[in-house]
Amino acid sequence: IKAGANLINDTWAGHDPELLEVAGAHGMGYVCSHTGGALPRTNPVRVRYDDVVDDVISETGKLAQRAVDAGVPEDRILIDPTHDFGKNTYHGLELLRRCNELVATGWPVLMALSNKDFVGETLDRPVEQRVPGTLAATAHAAAAGVAVFRSHQVSETLDVCRMTLAISGDFAPLHPVRGLV
């Protein structure tokens, strides 16, 4: 906080309740993540959900309400399905396939897709070869209305988001001259 941070990205889904209190007391933003009940720094196996998207919506919604109750400003709350945390590759793909349902909750959605295991397992690629898969996933999520992306490839991710928004008519080309002058 002293260094200027204004957002807490709680990747462990409220496991440490003091983070909510700190965010509320200081008017900070808060990212409500979903880990499927996984404890911090664990890597669960054979994770099962009746419906992973419904579970993410339910749990992040509850955490968002806890954040509001702790004093976090509603306009500073985001939800994050938290790909790879308490989820397998099939869950990650389902969350992307149905990310419009997350957007429909009304909470801004954050996704951290960069170089994730679900990308590597889907394409059978090591971490250093996951950029194309990451950018494809990002384009899909951006087209569905995901608001924020955490990325290792910032410039490329920005270009993908801008191009996706330009295709949908929600972003004006930065330098349109061909055939216009």
Where are these regions (language model features)?
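Active-site-adjacent loop and "lid" segments of alpha/beta metabolic enzymes
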Residues: K2, N6-R66, G86-V181
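Phosphate/pyrophosphate-binding loops at sites that engage ATP/ADP/AMP, CoA/4′-phosphopantetheine
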Residues: L63-R76
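Short strand-loop junctions, especially beta-strand C-caps/beta-turns
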Residues: T82-D84
